[in-house]
Amino acid sequence: MDENTKPKAMKQKTLVSPNVTIPSVTEDDLETSVSNLTNNMIAHINSKALKRPGTFAIGEKATSVGRVKRNMNITVGDKHKNDIPVVMVLGLVASKAVQDYYKWNKELPKDINVSVEYSTALPAREYDPSVAQKFENRFLDETHVVDIYVNATPVTVRINFDKVKVTQEGVPAVYALIEGGEKLLAEYHSAYGQGIGNKDFKNRKLLLVDIGDGTTEFIYVVKGKPVNDLCEGKRYGVGHAADVAKKLFDEDVKVDISMTRQQFMQVVFDKDHHFHDKANGALEDAKVEQSEMILEQITDMFLNTLSGNVDDVVVFGGGSAAFKDDMYDDLKEFTNSVNARTLWVPKEMAPSLNAIGLDILNDKVFFKGVVAGNGE
């Protein structure tokens, strides 16, 4: 049966655990299992786009199963060759296809055929048209076969990509700024007045700071276009703060507690946990260190790499909210001192700013009105 499934703005942790065991026990009723499928993705993927076929736990599920965890802490020039973004996309498309089929038919199919139009972005420092074409071709060149497991039941999803567009990081964020509306600029306008509106960012010189879990991208944009040679990526982010915090916590409690980084973060969020105060204190200390490193990188790029030729420093990304209390005042003081401005994207929009921009590009540029999947 053909299902023309074109998912939109699906979000999931960029984490994969390879060589996991296929589920053998049915834990939940069917409707609950389908509803939670994107958070419980285990899939066998057979695709020439991957170095080898395999069974993977994907996204949130990879935090709880499998001995090996692979995430998107990607080195320079690596994302277009890495298997993780391909595994993530195929798993998400397959799970969404099963959810959509079940929504309309109230039963699991044995197999589904899916057609997809997909957009994504490569790091600006990695991007050039030939590299983008190679990455696009990994999706376009064949049918990808995914057996996605709903509890212990496999559903075969055959995925064909009709169109794929790879742009460079920075471009989607600028489109999101231009189309973002007053809510995005409320704090900015409170600090600097109403003189600069959303549309004006198309012609301004921007230092975009995209703070993630394992990496922070520093993207220099002039009149809407990233200047690739002046963009950098550093291994700063929330994940690194958590790693440092876990070490500080271990030193503080002085007992041998076996705990992964993910389990440590659960203690941080659980206010009733016996060790919550110590874990939270360790994380706050570690965040200060990471904040200082990010701020130092911003000032160094601004003053040296970019020779001060910046109108606005724009901070966003999934990790930006965690660092705002430690960074915002110091960053604003710095930008004020060099006749520039700070735009810290609100936490409601910051994690999805790239996805918002890709949706705009899908409608206005890439696919012109077609609802398409996108990924970061």
Show which residues each predicted segment covers.
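Conserved short-loop catalytic and cofactor-binding motifs
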Residues: 233, 282, 346
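A mobile "lid/hinge" subdomain adjacent to the ATP/sugar-phosphate binding pocket shared
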Residues: 249-285
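Glycine-rich phosphate-binding loop plus the immediately following alpha-helix
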Residues: 19-30, 170-185, 213, 219-259, ...
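Detector for glycine-centered tight turns/loop "hinges" at secondary-structure junctions
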Residues: 5, 224-225, 272-273
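Nucleotide/phosphate-binding catalytic cleft detector across ATP-hydrolyzing
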Residues: 2-206, 292-315, 320-376
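Short coil/turn segments at secondary-structure junctions
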Residues: 73-80, 229, 278-282
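A short acidic Gly-Thr/Ser loop motif
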Residues: 1, 199-216, 221-224, 235-238, ...
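Contiguous effector/interaction surfaces
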Residues: 286-290
